[in-house]
């Protein structure tokens, strides 16, 4: 690369753009043999003046192409290639002398080219590129490093050139080397393998730089926003301030979240606590046993009557009433009153009469004497006081002496075989005119006094049935 002293006048890259409604660039183009193409008169406040053209400037390149040795007609064609915009590399007559004397061609590859803002109306002054800023720039060109694995691979992108605008990245192959390096469609190439690229750089030259190494290439590319930022702030591109792309493989880490939902049933609008998922709910089926008790009712008549007994079965639920833990006989008897699900069954057996009254009497569990009771009448025992029991014992002795006589009617019209009470129509020991509660209380008291725990099973049944 040619070393150019800093005091040498640099060439200027002037961008001439027409604004809305403008039809001319506002300058004249002259050609002289031995001088080449140069700028004639420049109209004030014209696109040419705003672009930095000065009368007498020599023209060395137009829209990225060198015009050295080209005729006037060819140069005009290049200028008119874009009717609204034109880039020209120019230098003053005095400034060109040093290059002629030192045999240095003025081309777009010179390192000291100065870019002129299109909106500037002042004569441009060369300012060396500023040092890299300490703070990160908001817009940086991207450094894309493309490396092939084998010679038969492709970089995976297309190169497009637009006259007067530069070289751009076209289609980028998905998953290719170019995409992995960070290339995107629409980026402008501003550098190739360490060398800056300008809009005036020839297309063949850019292609040659890319193919310089068949296995790898390094591109400096700028998106539309980055390019606009550099133009607006008159910032030259540099290989020192770049955005690097991390080409290391990305490891995708997937995190699986397992959420187990346990539905909680509701009962009557209230939340039920959730069950342990490891617990087992067991529905215990309880078998209800049945217990059957048999109660025998005996009826004893005289020797001429048939001996009858009734046997009834009562079935009740063993779990309906808990067992009575009491030594009181009456509690055990009345503890089974009003049992649910009680079924009654009965049958009557008639036994043939016997001549031996003593054998008949021995079958009875009653302590009272036998009396004449009609067959259709149900015998219900009643219990009298101690004096009444003595009277019955006397009556029993009387019956033994007259067992062959005809039985006489019951006294006082009592159908139970006992005399009725002489006061208020009821005997004090008669419990059948009392309520069930009063009867139980009176019998409980009598049991304590007269040891009624010797009652037969028949008497207990009759007593319970009449409650």
UniProtKB/Swiss-Prot annotation:
CDD domains associated with the record: PDZ_NHERF-like (cd06768)
Residue ranges of domain PDZ in the record: 12-94, 143-225
Disruption phenotype: Viable, with no gross anatomy or growth defects observed. Localization of aat-6 at the intestinal apical cell membrane diminishes as animals age, and eventually aat-6 becomes diffusely dispersed in the cytoplasm. RNAi-mediated knockdown in a pept-1 (lg601) mutant background results in a reduced number of progeny.
Record PTM: Phosphorylated.
Highest taxon of the lineage: Eukaryota
Pfam families with a match to the protein in the record: PDZ_6 (PF17820)
Main location: membrane
Tissue specificity remark: Expressed in the excretory canal and intestine. Expressed on the apical cell membrane of intestinal cells (at protein level).
Keywords, sorted A to Z: Cell membrane, Cell projection, Membrane, Repeat
Biased composition (Polar residues): 407-425
MF term (GO), any: protein-membrane adaptor activity
GO biological process entries: intracellular amino acid homeostasis; L-amino acid transport; protein localization to plasma membrane
One annotated Gene Ontology cellular component of this protein: amino acid transport complex
UniProt keyword annotation of Nucleotide-binding present: no
InterPro entries per UniProt: NHER, PDZ, PDZ_6, PDZ_sf
Chain spans, region Disordered: 344-429
Subcellular location per the Swiss-Prot or TrEMBL entry: Cell projection, Microvillus membrane; Apical cell membrane
Entry-linked SMART domains: PDZ
Function: Scaffold protein that connects plasma membrane proteins with members of the ezrin/moesin/radixin family and thereby helps to link them to the actin cytoskeleton and to regulate their surface expression. Anchors the amino acid transporter protein aat-6 to the apical cell membrane of intestinal cells, particularly in older animals, in order to maintain amino acid homeostasis. May play a role in promoting fertility.
Domain notes: The PDZ 2 domain is required for the interaction with the amino acid transporter protein aat-6.
Oligomeric and partner information: Interacts (via PDZ 2 domain) with aat-6 (via PDZ-binding motif); the interaction sequesters aat-6 to the apical cell membrane of intestinal cells.
Record protein name field: Na(+)/H(+) exchange regulatory cofactor-like protein nrfl-1
